[in-house]
Amino acid sequence: MFENYDKENMFESIWNFPNNLKDAIVLGNGIDLKNDYSHINNIVIAGMGGSAIGGDIVSVLENSNIKIPYTVCRDYSIPGWVNSSSLVICSSYSGNTEETISAFHKSIERGASICGITTGGTLLKLLKENKKDFIKIPSGLQPRAAVAFSFIPLIKLIEKIGLIKSELDLWIEKSIDVLEKKRIIYSKEGNENPVYQLAQKIYKKIP
């Protein structure tokens, strides 16, 4: 029934979220850094939309583990204090987000260290041309459905650099187990589905 309304197939994206978490862990564990980051004393995540949300999730999950200033920047510019001791991580699913590309160029001007997370596009080209470390994530998803690939590789990257010691793997393992069980319950049609029951209760009502 829901197929008539789910034109962008978000059901499949949500169903696959536990699988994406597993794939993102594998991807993050395989990071191979070429550059030196031993001098870094602050981190900026430059991104928009789902990519910026990934940065927000990291801030919440690792708040007590990150021992240096950490901020998410949703803008064409970057904070005025960014300098050669800063790490700017440019995150754009498409690789063509204007604000993120602009932040990349401004980070170059400031002499900041730069890493990137993207599927390709202009950002990947710039990262390669400037010999910056990057994580290439899977394409073919809607950006808002690619959250697993916007926050897990980000945590793994910061951990690989040595700026945090995360317990992400244990947390994700438990989360995957819960999600795999819940997706079966929440994918049923009709009154067996608690989400369907809730929808019926609030239908034509203002919460």
Residue map of PLM features:
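Short, non-transmembrane cytosolic segments of multipass membrane proteins
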Residues: 1-5
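Active-site phosphate/pyrophosphate-binding segments
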Residues: 6-9, 13, 28, 32, ...
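The first (N-terminal) embedded transmembrane alpha-helix
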Residues: 13-20
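Short gly/ser/thr-rich secondary-structure transition/capping motifs
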Residues: 23-30, 68-74, 189-192
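Glycine-rich phosphate-binding loops that contact phosphosugars or nucleotide phosphates
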Residues: 37-184
